[in-house]
A protein has these predicted regions:
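N-terminal entry module detector
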Residues: 1-61
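Long, highly hydrophobic alpha-helical transmembrane signal-anchor segments
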Residues: 19-20, 28, 49-95, 135-160
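Hydrophobic alpha-helical transmembrane segments
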Residues: 13, 22, 35, 47, ...
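Selective recognition of hydrophobic, aromatic-rich stretches within alpha-helical transmembrane segments
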Residues: 49, 53, 86-121, 162-194, ...
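Interfacial aromatic "cap" segments that immediately flank transmembrane helices
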Residues: 18-37, 128-158, 183-223
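Membrane-interface segments at transmembrane-helix boundaries
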Residues: 4-18, 56-76, 103-142, 187-206, ...
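Extended alpha-helical regions
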Residues: 215, 219, 225, 248-255
Length: 255
């Protein structure tokens, strides 16, 4: 499978997820609870973000005096660049707000997403059907919860560094891309965990399928430009990611 095919497959992951969930009552029910949580969080973010922008900006400026000086310089000396800087800054804020809400939803919805992915992989023939798979589901859910909490610590450290880098001229371009890749990997990680991939195998899968993750990251960024849309669509990304993972794995197994 060519790199361009992988890229397109990654780009259309959410639409694969929509089709899967909307055409299966069982998958729909598994996605419904975290989806309702996502809708609630999305509405809350949409309202709070646009009604408290001034307060949020004041807090940022008080916390980072050097940023205040930087913005005063840009706004005072080069008004056009200042406007561009402010626009990019708010894009950055929206992306990171969505990212942290995504982490919260992953933690809350981990048991449902684990079972959702497991059902899809069984349907695609990558997992053997098990009549009483409650123990496996419970084990996978707890393991994914622990992994998610561990990744939360790592990602919070990384996002703190990215937050500082974002105020560098190239940072406002690189940060959304990196955030997109981080979330793209996390969406596929449910499938990798169900297949019992080791850390080395997960890293190898990521590096050997960069075109697929690039398409998926781009789809995530597209959905992120409308506040709340990505959090509402998260079950579709995870379900579509599992289906795409199965498709790629089976295609590579036959070549």
């Amino acid at each position: 499978m060519s790199s361009s095919t992988h890229f397109v497959k990654g780009l259309f992951v959410p639409f694969r997820g929509i089709y899967l969930i909307m055409t299966s009552f069982q998958l729909f029910m598994l996605a419904l609870i975290p989806l309702l949580l996502a809708i609630g969080v999305g509405i809350f973010l949409l309202v709070s973000l646009w009604t408290n922008t001034a307060t949020f900006m004041e807090l940022i400026l008080e916390w980072l005096p050097w940023l205040h000086q930087l913005m005063q310089f840009r706004l005072g000396d080069i008004s056009l660049l200042g406007m561009i800087f402010q626009g990019l800054f708010w894009i950055f804020v929206i992306l990171f707000t969505i990212y942290f809400s995504y982490l919260a939803l992953i933690i809350i919805g981990a048991p449902f997403y684990s079972l959702l992915v497991d059902k899809i992989l069984v349907r695609r023939g990558l997992q053997p059907p098990v009549q009483n798979n409650f123990i496996r589901w419970l084990y996978t859910s707890l393991k994914m919860l622990i992994i998610t909490l561990f990744k939360l610590v790592i990602f919070m450290t990384a996002t703190g560094l990215l937050f500082i880098v974002s105020f560098w001229s190239l940072g406002v371009i690189l940060v959304p891309i990196l955030v997109g890749f981080m979330i793209a990997y996390d969406c596929i990680d449910f499938s990798l965990e169900c297949m019992n991939y080791s850390l080395r195998e997960r890293w190898n899968y990521f590096t050997s399928h960069l075109s697929f993750f690039s398409g998926l990251a781009l789809a995530i960024l597209f959905f992120s430009f409308i506040p709340g849309l990505f959090t509402i669509s998260l079950p579709f990304f995870i379900a579509g990611g599992a289906d795409a993972f199965a498709s790629i794995t089976q295609s590579e197994a036959t070549t």
